Regions:
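Positively charged N-terminal leader segments that act as targeting/secretion signals
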Residues: 5-22
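Helical scaffold of the NTase/Pol beta-like nucleotidyltransferase catalytic core
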Residues: 28-64, 95-96, 292
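Glycine- and acidic
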Residues: 30-35, 86, 262-267
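Conserved NTP/Mg2+-binding pocket subregion across the NTase superfamily
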Residues: 31-34, 97, 102-208, 212-215, ...
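Soluble or luminal CAZymes and related metallo-dependent hydrolases
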Residues: 40, 44, 99, 272, ...
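Catalytic metal-binding acidic patch
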Residues: 66-104, 113-122
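Conserved nucleotidyltransferase catalytic core and NTase-mimicking acidic/glycine-rich helix/loop elements
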Residues: 158-292
Length: 292
C-alpha cells in the first residue's frame, strides 16, 4: 500500500507551492516545516519538465507533482524513488507514448532517473482506481510502459494533501476529492488481506527486505490510524521505537540497521529475526484491528 518495494520483492498513494524561488517545496504535516526539494531531485525535475513540454502542448499539461518520501521530507539519496504524477487534460496518444518512452530512457542514464516511478493520468480519471480506468502510461524504475501502476486511496490522498507542485495547477487545487474513510479502508485491506497473508509465510522473513518492509509499513499504518495523516517510513519506524515494549527493541534496532547501515553486522540471527518479525507483525495486526 505505502510502498512498492514489497510488491517488487515478491514478484511478488494539500501543499501549496509557497515560493517559486525554491522551485518547489512542501510541508512536514506533523511539524509544519517547509521542505525544499533536494538539489539532485530539483535538477532532475527541471530537466524532466523542460523535455515534457517538448512532447505535450502547454495546455495539455495540467500539472506535475511529487509525492512519496520526497514530499514527506524523508529523501534518501541512495535509495529513495522519485514518485511523481503528471496530470494531463486528456489521454496520451500513440506518438506521445513513444516520445515518453524515449524521454524516460534518456533520463534513466542518471542514477536518480532510473528511480523515477510515476503515472500520466488524464484529468477525468483523477481520484479513480485502476479497475475504473483505461490503461495509462506509467513509469517504473525509470522505464515507461502502458498498463496500470500504484494507485489507491493513499496515492490520491497524499497527492491532494501532501503533494509538491513542480509545474501547473497547485496540488491542493486539482479537481478531485478523496475521503479519509477511503484511506482507512485501504489500510484495513492492507492489514487484513496483504499482511495477514504474509504472516502465514514465515520463510519470507528470512529475507532482509521483507523484515524491513513488514515493520516500517505497519508502523506507518499504525501512525496513520492514530494521527490521521501519512508519514514516511522513517517516521513509521520511529513511532514504533517510541511506543513498543522492550521485547521488540532489538528487532526495531535491527530494522534501523537494515535501513541506515545495511553493510554492518546483523544484531540477530536470521532464524531469530524471522521469528521475531512474524510475531511482531501479528502483534501489530491485532493492534490495528482495535482501531477499525
Amino acid at each position: 500500500m505505502f510502498t512498492k518495494k514489497s510488491r517488487n520483492i515478491y514478484k511478488a498513494g494539500s501543499l501549496c507551492e509557497f515560493a517559486k524561488a525554491f522551485f518547489i517545496g512542501g510541508i512536514d504535516v506533523k511539524n509544519g516545516v517547509k521542505h525544499a526539494l533536494p538539489t539532485e531531485v530539483q535538477q532532475l525535475m527541471e530537466r524532466y519538465t523542460i523535455e515534457l513540454k517538448e512532447i505535450f502542448l502547454d495546455e495539455k499539461i495540467v500539472g506535475v507533482y511529487i509525492y512519496g518520501s520526497i514530499a514527506l521530507g524523508a529523501f534518501h539519496a541512495e535509495t529513495s524513488d522519485v514518485d511523481f504524477v503528471t496530470v494531463i487534460s486528456d489521454s496520451v496518444n500513440e506518438a506521445e507514448k513513444q516520445q515518453l518512452v524515449e524521454l524516460h530512457k534518456k533520463l534513466s542514464n542518471s542514477t536518480l532517473g532510473k528511480r523515477m516511478d510515476g503515472m500520466y493520468i488524464p484529468l477525468a480519471d483523477l481520484g479513480k482506481y485502476n479497475d475504473e480506468m483505461n490503461e495509462y502510461v506509467y513509469c517504473a524504475d525509470g522505464k515507461a510502459d502502458v498498463g496500470y501502476w500504484d494507485i489507491n486511496a493513499v496515492t490520491w490522498w497524499t497527492l491532494k494533501n501532501q503533494g509538491i507542485t513542480v509545474t501547473g495547477k497547485e496540488a491542493e487545487d486539482i479537481p478531485f476529492q478523496i475521503r479519509w474513510n477511503d484511506v482507512v479502508n485501504t489500510m484495513k485491506y492492507n492489514v487484513e488481506q496483504y499482511w495477514s497473508e504474509k504472516a502465514k509465510q514465515p520463510y519470507l522473513f528470512f529475507i532482509e527486505e521483507w523484515v524491513e518492509s513488514a515493520v516500517v509499513t505497519m508502523g506507518r499504518i499504525l501512525y496513520t490510524l492514530d494521527h490521521k495523516t501519512i508519514v514516511s517510513k522513517d517516521s513509521g519506524l520511529q513511532y514504533l521505537l517510541e511506543r513498543s515494549g522492550e521485547e521488540w527493541e532489538l528487532l526495531l534496532q535491527e530494522v534501523a540497521r537494515i535501513r541506515q547501515h545495511p553493510k554492518e553486522k546483523r544484531m540477530l540471527s536470521r532464524w531469530r529475526r524471522a521469528d521475531m518479525t512474524r510475531k511482531y507483525l501479528l502483534h501489530l495486526i491485532e493492534t490495528c484491528r482495535e482501531k477499525w
